[in-house]
Each structure stands twice: as structure tokens, then as C-alpha cells.
Amino acid sequence: MVNFTVDEIRALMDRKRNIRNMSVIAHVDHGKSTLTDSLVSKAGIIAGSKAGETRFTDTRKDEQERCITIKSTAISLFFELEKKDLEFVKGENQFETVEVDGKKEKYNGFLINLIDSPGHVDFSSEVTAALRVTDGALVVVDCVSGVCVQTETVLRQAIAERIKPVLFMNKMDRALLELQLGAEELFQTFQRIVENINVIIATYGDDDGPMGPIMVDPSIGNVGFGSGLHGWAFTLKQFAEMYAGKFGVQVDKLMKNLWGDRFFDLKTKKWSSTQTDESKRGFCQFVLDPIFMVFDAVMNIKKDKTAALVEKLGIKLANDEKDLEGKPLMKVFMRKWLPAGDTMLQMIAFHLPSPVTAQKYRMEMLYEGPHDDEAAVAIKTCDPNGPLMMYISKMVPTSDKGRFYAFGRVFSGKVATGMKARIQGPNYVPGKKEDLYEKTIQRTILMMGRFIEPIEDIPSGNIAGLVGVDQYLVKGGTITTYKDAHNMRVMKFSVSPVVRVAVEAKNPADLPKLVEGLKRLAKSDPMVQCIFEESGEHIIAGAGELHLEICLKDLEEDHACIPLKKSDPVVSYRETVQSESNQICLSKSPNKHNRLHCTAQPMPDGLADDIEGGTVNARDEFKARAKILAEKYEYDVTEARKIWCFGPDGTGPNLLMDVTKGVQYLNEIKDSVVAGFQWATREGVLSDENMRGVRFNVHDVTLHADAIHRGGGQIIPTARRVFYASVLTAEPRLLEPVYLVEIQCPEAAVGGIYGVLNRRRGHVFEESQVTGTPMFVVKAYLPVNESFGFTADLRSNTGGQAFPQCVFDHWQVLPGDPLEAGTKPNQIVLDTRKRKGLKEGVPALDNYLDKM
């Protein structure tokens, strides 16, 4: 089926049990886009002969040049299963039925919406956006380098979003041709990767959860093996089918024998689970040996043997392919024998959930409102006749400058051209008017890699693009027709924007264009932050050097179209305290009638991370939350119940606790104190950076009897001053962000790595050899501040043999007292204050502390 007509696709969209929404995720350079090509060529949008070289989903010019994927792109595929394969599609909501001659049969056409996502850690926000709109993930692992740090990060994100994984081991051609591994070694390599992936799944998911068991296991067929570049792949099902007739057993029974410790004795023709001299492992004997035989015959140019194999396996070579030899013949041969497209599409159809199955258990993760209102029920049943609920996960720039398609997924109802809908931004609160627009949707479109197709309407369970809502949304949001609908939950990113660059226009007259360009940039990338400082600076914050480089290039060439001046990258810091305040701080209100007494103290280790990770949440039921705090962090239960709020922004990693005893009018000023606390934690006392891991205690409050003398104008500034004073008396410190660096290199280059890391205040905490290969993996912590130019430095010191991957990992205290002149933190504070246009020098305690 080469020519897709929109009507045919539209008909398929209604068969929601036969839809599979999936994304391809992996570590950088493990071959996602190349593998996606063989899927796309099978579904007939690229010509089959070009697959493996075109990287169809890398739509941007810089993606083709750098050979990396930067933005995630979506594409729809159509695939028809053969009759014999339909029995492998199990589960009541996994297939539609059609009537054939009065009998009900499974419908064999599947619509697969595939999203190819980037593997580079700087773009992991793109991955998050892709995961939100899909239900299944194809995890690609390079079988030579194994499970890497980024594989773990994306897999963890997938499981947190309740997305079911299937595994594919890529680059088998390298394992056979470059490393020349034997059959048993190759089996051990595969088994180790499967174990590693299952360890990650077990760590972050649970088998008794609503998704059921999601472990990957080759013997059920949710693990594929192959080579994306050469365009061939298999699961154990393909081989079991070849032998099933010969052995006279069922395919699924045979699959169990083709993996793990199952050995086949050639003399007695029996399977056993112990190895004897006569027996050989099933996987090696029946799966790998035939492949090794083909490789041996073709690569060593044994013409007669090759001809015999061609005949035996029933491969039809075209006339111009008969004269090939060596690697080109290898590709053609394997591609005809074990075509990657068929294998992968079958695995997707069998093992990934349909929207109907997935939305049952994903609804509670996705929807913020009550789980029994009309919208929630419609999402849960994926009901095309319910109210429209659609989540927009990102904006895709169009060829028309400055306009965007909104890209997202319809969870319930139908979205149609020209319909009126409510567009709810991330800050929308039900019942209020802010961040809410009621507008018509101009067009609904189908996303097809590099092309788009207009379409009348799109029902639930599908991925869609919308035209005409981009003016009302910044990065994402919810589109609905149900007036009481709550928002779909905002995405949690695994990295945080810690590197900043200030930009200005070379020609001051271009300033309006720059501002407009920054607004567009903020739309087009789910992660980047554009900040307009009060000092007039324009700041772009990103996840790392590469991310910022791409953002600035986009800004200069696509969004603002003007020449720019860029500052050197600077790092965001956080402020914290190290001990409890050495006195109870007091501040009086401007009219001297109200007094607040407070202290600050550091939080126990791990609590700030728990708040950011969502384990301890501002929206939790307060008794349940107090219980967690008391058990895990040894907080006093009565105090833990009296948490007034989290900050900054109501969700940040700082706490405001009420430890007062019997104070009058306390509730009346609570809002004002909370506002002061949000202000103080958002702009810390040292250098206006966010605070992190500080717990403030309100000890006593003396208030004026007249309500008019204790309004917000009196209390808010006072609260901020008393919080600043309590920080300054509690040994303030700066926190700097730290990358976790994973470096792969040959043994000879390890020495050079240590040298580079030591010069940059980094330290290695783990070094291990990748079993079965000469490569070493070095893991180290490296402060973000020292990471600029790290890659180039590392390559020059190791002769270009080491490849680093940096992921933001944690915050650590910068050694030294920022209040003491001449220390490094003090220098950073002074530089930051100067850059932000604040008063020079750290403010003295007397500015904030009042005498009785």
C-alpha cells in the first residue's frame, strides 16, 4: 500500500483498537532514526531501496548534517498482518473485529503512529513531549555498547508516564563483523542487556501495578534483534515459525526453548535445561548458527554455498542482485530473509497497547481533575462520542515564519476543522478565566514526517496537528469542549535548564524583532526558558551547551532573523543554608505595630529531591504527607501537619512551617506571610537566585488589634525581611549544579580522562569494562560551571577516542563562605549581583534584622 489517501487513513482512525501510538527511544547514536526508516519503508512512504540512508524523520537540515535527531517527528504507518499472525494479538481491547461471511474475524489492518525522538541528553525534553502522546515505546539498544546512561533516563521517564516498553537490540552487524563474537558470547551479550533493561524496569515500575507485568522477555517475543543499517531484524517468533513444522510443535512453545538455559541434544532430539557434551544452547543452535552460516558464506565469497542457501531459504534475488558479492549481497540477502519492517511492525502490533487498553491505566496519571467526572470517564474508555479532551505536547514550526502547528493527542471525543473549543494553558484553574481562550480550530492536519495532509476530523486515540491555536498556547496545554474540564497534567522534565546565555541584537533597532524571536523560540522548544531581566537583559536558559547552541542558531536564522551578540554561558546557582539560625530573627512592619519571629534550618538530605520528584507534593493530603515526613525524615508529626506552603511557585523545594503556639489573628495574615515567603525563596538574599532545601519556621507573631494596621502592605515586606535575616544567620551557602558524565573509551585513553577531570574539579566514582568488548566506561561528577569546552578538551587529550555524555544529576554545596571576602562563592555572588544590576556587595544583616 504505497499511496495513502486521507480517506483510507480516516477510516482506520475509527478502529481505535487497531491503533498503536508508539515512540522510539534510545541513547544517542544507537540507531533510532535508521531503524525508523525500515519501518517507514515497509509502510510505503519511502521507496524500499533507499531505506537506511535517508533518515526520513530527521527533517531539519542541521539534523542531516550533524547526523543527530534534534526534534521529535511523527509519522503514520499502515500495516496488514497475515491471517496466521493474528492469533498472536491477545487481549480484548487489542483488536477490532469485522464480519466475514457471517463469521466474526479479527481485523488485520493496523494504524501505527510512530514518533522518532532524539537520544541526545540535551534534548530529553523532546523525548518527554513524545512520550506523553504515545502508549508504547520501542527501546533501542546498541548491542555493542550496551545499556547507557541515557537509555536509563528515557526508560525511567517512559515507566513514570506508564508507557509499555519493548526492546530492540540494534547493530548486530557490528557485533558479527567488527567484534567477531562467537555464538555463546553473543548470547551472553544479549542476555546481559535484557537483564539490565529489566533491572531498570523493576526499579521504577511494579509488576502488581495497573499495567501488569511489563518486563521484556525474548521468549514471549517482545525483544527484537537485528541491524537497522542493513535493514534486517528478527524476534524468536520468526525462527520458531521456520522450525515449528519440522518439529511438529506450536510456535509459542518452541519460542520458550529458544532462549535462556534450554539445550537441545542432537542425538536424542530432546530438550533439557542442563548442558551435556552432546547438546547445544537452543538460541545458539537454531537462531545464531544459521545467521553465522549466511555471514560466513557471503562475506568469504563462497559462491556455491551462497547459492545453496539462497535456494534453501527461498530468497528471490532480482537479476541485478545476482552478481553482487561481499557486504552489498549480505545486505540484500538478510533484508529479503528477515525484513526488519515486518518483524518490527509485528512486534509493535502484538506487544504494544492500543489506546483503549492504555488509557484505562494512564488516565489517573494524565488527568488532574476528579477521576469520575465526564472527561475522566471519556478518557478512560477512549470514547469518540464523549467531550473532546486533547493534550498539546509541543509546537512545530511551519514553513510560514512565526506560525506553529500545535502537535498533540486526542484522548477522547473528536477534534474537527472549524469547531469551537476551550484552549486551556498550563496555569488554568477550573472556574477562573485566566489562561483560557474559547476559539475555533482553523484546520486539523495529519503529520507525516516532512509532509502534512489536511483532514476533516480526528477521533480519540490518535495523534493530530492543529492550525490556528498557536497564538494562545506557549508550549503546551489542554484543548477541550467540556466546560468543567480540568487540565491534563503538565509534563515533568528529567533535566533542568541550568546553563544560561544573555543575547542582544547587534543593531539596537532590531530589538522588537529579538523579543518576537524569543517568544517564538520559547514556543518551539518544550524546555528552553526565555527570561526578560529587570536590568534589560534577555536570557536564554537551556539544558546544556549543545541545546543552547541549537537554540541560538534557531533564534538567529529562523525566529528573529537578525545578527546577535551572545555572552559566554553562565550557570544558575541555588542558595541554601547549612545550620540552624543562631538566633530567632525579628522584623517589624513599616508601621512598627507588627512583629514576626522566624528561624531557618536546612532540610534533611534527600527531601528537596523528593519534593522535586513529586514524592512529597504540595497537593497531597496533609495527614498522609505528615506521615511520610515523620517516618522518612524524622520530622515532628504535629509540625509536619502545619506546613503552610512550598516555594517558590507553590511547588519548590523549600518549606514554610508554622510552629507558633496560640497566636491570635494568625490565619488572617497567613496569605501575606506565604506571599513574602514565595518572594524570598524566588529571589534569595545572596544573589537573587532561587533558594533550595531551606525550611523556615514561624515561631511567634505579634499583631496589631486593628485589621487595618496588619494588611498585606505591612506584612509581606516584613515577612520577606525576616526570611532574609534568618538565612543570613544560618550560614548561607551556594549550591552549584553537577553533571553526571559517562565516558566510553578504549583502555589506553583512561589516563587522559582522569587528567582532564581533575583539572575541572570533577571526580570519577565508577570505572568498569564493558564485558566482551575492549571499551571502558568511566562515570564521573563534573560541575556544570567547569563543563564548557569539556568535550573538545577531552577529545584532544585522548586522541579523539573518548565520547562523553553529560546529564544534570544533582546540586552540591560550593565549598567556602559566600559572606567572607576572597572566597570563590563570594566572587560568584559579587559577579552575579553586578550582572543583574543589584547593589554591590552582599547585603548586611542589619538591613533585615530589627531590635526589640
From Swiss-Prot:
Its main location: cytoplasm. It is an enzyme of class 3 (hydrolase). One of its GO terms (molecular function) is GTP binding. Disruption phenotype: Ray defect. It catalyses: GTP + H2O = GDP + phosphate + H(+). Its EC number is 3.6.5.-. It is found in: Cytoplasm. The keyword 4Fe-4S does not apply. GTP binds at residues 26-33, 170-173, 227-229. One of its GO terms (biological process) is defense response to Gram-negative bacterium. The modification Phosphothreonine is found at residues 57, 59. CDD domains: aeEF2_snRNP_like_IV (cd01681), eEF2_snRNP_like_C (cd04096), EF2 (cd01885), EF2_snRNP_III (cd16261). Pfam families: EFG_C, EFG_III, EFG_IV, GTP_EFTU, GTP_EFTU_D2. One of its GO terms (cellular component) is ribonucleoprotein complex. Belongs to the TRAFAC class translation factor GTPase superfamily. Classic translation factor GTPase family. EF-G/EF-2 subfamily. This is Elongation factor 2.
